[in-house]
């Protein structure tokens, strides 16, 4: 007898079916009773069925023998075992992909779509999916194409569909032939073989009863299984949920079209074959769930007190609302955790919110979101082995393999294995540091590490670390030699069996399987069953894939295809999940079938774009293709547009979700996503909001501290409270940000009684101040020494942000060295080029203005060749791109040098010193300043290098100027100098002044200025609106701007003595504008006029004194242990812009204790007034 039971979505059909099956089992215990359900709910349904049997028996517990709760796949295996039928080896998706790639390559000339195009992995996957549909649908593509080509048939296909079918037919026939030859079974073969078995062996089910529930649609083969069971089984009962429990003629677009069509297909088959069947509509009891279901379908508008809509500030607020509600319901109303179900359209979006918050509130939960295998260490090992075979010495791949901890050398594990593993990981970190610092990649991994130490770029390069370096070299050789040997073996091997054996032996002999087993045992002993099964599942899948590969490709081994198959298979694989507890909250994805019996259901993430779940993923045969094929299908052979069916079923599926709760449904959405983008509610949410007349709860991230009414504030605060541990943060926030409240104080006191240590941590966190504390003078002396030896750039960093100075030069923290040709290294290359150029000219007693353009280039070529032989630059040249960059740099230095050569023909200043070092033990004395704060008992010594010093020996005096090379355009900024952020130019002038006798040989020495030399190849724009445009307003060419020559003029700080510049700059004899100095122009009276960067000799002397005061102040504060998080800010430039220590600072301008030190805009008069004031204080 066949029964079709129907009811509303809110009716307990699943419970009804389980009850009938249990009673049937008890009435006929010797016969098989089957409950067929979707795989996702098999476990929970089995628990419910056994529980129902126990209830009917009047027991608390029971066992069953012939009551089976199965999915379709498990049903197939059940009967295969019963019939002693062995199924062929199941074909993995990765193996199927490999077969299809081989077919397409072989058939390429015959194919239409793939003839001239590459079939990528995504397209292959679509083709395979369509092949499975064709196979399941029993469709004869060749016959279909013949019918479409027959003029007598009044049907036709468009060109796209015909071409796709043509290619699909060729590929499909070859695929089936290969699968048959290899004795494989495709993943849809289970149902096909099951149906063949049932058709040939009706005795297997003739005494059995079947109960089918929680399906709204069957695939073609599943439908055939139902038809066969209906024909041969002793009893067959179906349960379907329709709009109102009635069965009507299906019409596309109707609410329950899909399930009605399923019922129609079944009953039509029953009637056509004269099967006796009856329909039963169960009573639909009044309930809140039925009211909500009716309202959702537009059947009346009852009072929906069981529906709560929630608008949340964020996903965190959504997750906290779920946890707080569950906590309250369990703690105050006697609910159990298994009464709650949480659904999300994309559960992965909430993975980092829900799980931690539920754990914090000690709420047990089962997350049925499957974990992907592709991040497991074994999978990373396999994937990176493939990369190393493709590109030997791929540094990221090699380091990734080391970090998997699957190939640890034996010498680390002798003795204490845990300590040995820790030592191994430390050595891997140091080896990575060394490799990155020296640019070790590809074939360089074959070299001993000592070959790289000449560059001296990392501490391990120093002789004192030789033993450590030897240990790292031993580790390097271990991995490189083993992997290189494996690569050679696999690349040279042509026999698949031998190659796979070599690969498998490599894993086993190097301890990979043993490590996996050790991880499994450790996780099992700690009670983490989910973690314990992962190593075993990964290893078993690998074994299965190796077997598949040998079946698909037993002869001609291709290592690239082998690793491609492994990577593809693991990228799609998931770990099986284990329910953590029978009493736990269930977290699941919306759209998956769920068991009944939940009291409260949360549907989170109900934002526009998430609900409804419209599926528009590309398929090989599109919806349009399938529509044009529809006329060629019949009831026993067809292809379903599963995507269209899912889209048509969206409202029905949402109705199913609403009907899962017997008591209450919560639907929420966040107003922003994790990127802070605004989100709109789903159209479903808006529709329900109208049904409840706009009744909506607002879940905030935090209690509203702006609430003045104490009673209302207390009510809001209580809505955030759960366990003492989880509530402490909210209570601390309320205590700090609200007026004195006896309630808050009492709640804080109560929480402290349970979580005293946590309360202290939160109190400290609430009072946390990221500003550093000063250190003692004694500790400062231990860090810096009694006297301070420093450079100008170091002191500038102190004024930019003194905390950074402490981290860099006190604690000596450094970012990890990397072998990259960055802005600093390019600047060093420019400096080195000009330094050696000057030395070479002095060595040969050559004046640059006497050289021809060609001679200068030859000299530069000689200098560059010398530089690139240095160990550091040899290291950079290992990267071909760096070789290109050096050529670009050389063009820049050539332009600057040639410009300098031309200008020297009109300038009498001569480059005398390059990279002139000053300081202790140098020929040129540095600044040595006693510190008044320490009564002169301590001092600062300034050291450094001046890029270039130019001198002019005149009749009356010697003039000196310093040149500083810059890779970006610079000017002398008064505010930055006044604040100490830019000390360099004036401090270096002070050094020259202090060494006047050495520089001038006892003659009168005068400072001309300090200037920036912009090292650039930039040109001026043709159509710029700025003064740098090549054409003026009358479209006249500005010849002085051609070639960007104006950018190469010297700019900086000038001593305002016109006669001195006329003495050295020949151009000023003919015209008022200098060709050497930017911004230098004589007025009619022969002066310079008022300019902020021009200073008289007396003013310059004051600046020199002032810079000494700044240096003395910085040194005194450093040696006193003063530290502050005080970054400067000037416009868009800040002391944090290029900092390597931002993750330490945690600087946040929104915090009341964090603020920038804003530099004022200063004119020359303002600067001089400030200087005079400071000098008076110094006296």
Curated annotation (Swiss-Prot):
Keywords: ATP-binding, DNA damage, DNA repair, DNA-binding, Exonuclease, Helicase, Hydrolase, Nuclease, Nucleotide-binding. Its EC number is 3.1.-.-. Transmembrane segments: none annotated. It comes from the Bacteria. InterPro entries: ADDB_N (IPR049035), DNA_helicase_suRexB (IPR014141), P-loop_NTPase (IPR027417), PDDEXK_AddAB-type (IPR038726), Restrct_endonuc-II-like (IPR011335). GO terms for molecular function: 5'-3' exonuclease activity; ATP binding; double-stranded DNA binding; helicase activity; hydrolase activity, acting on acid anhydrides. Its cofactor is Mg(2+). GO terms for biological process: double-strand break repair via homologous recombination. The keyword DNA-binding applies. Signal peptide: none annotated. Despite having helicase-like domains, this subunit does not have helicase activity. Heterodimer of AddA and RexB. Belongs to the helicase family. AddB/RexB type 2 subfamily. PANTHER family: RECBCD ENZYME SUBUNIT RECC. The heterodimer acts as both an ATP-dependent DNA helicase and an ATP-dependent, dual-direction single-stranded exonuclease. Recognizes the chi site generating a DNA molecule suitable for the initiation of homologous recombination. This subunit has 5' -> 3' nuclease activity but not helicase activity. This is ATP-dependent helicase/deoxyribonuclease subunit B. It comes from Lactobacillus delbrueckii subsp. bulgaricus (strain ATCC BAA-365 / Lb-18).
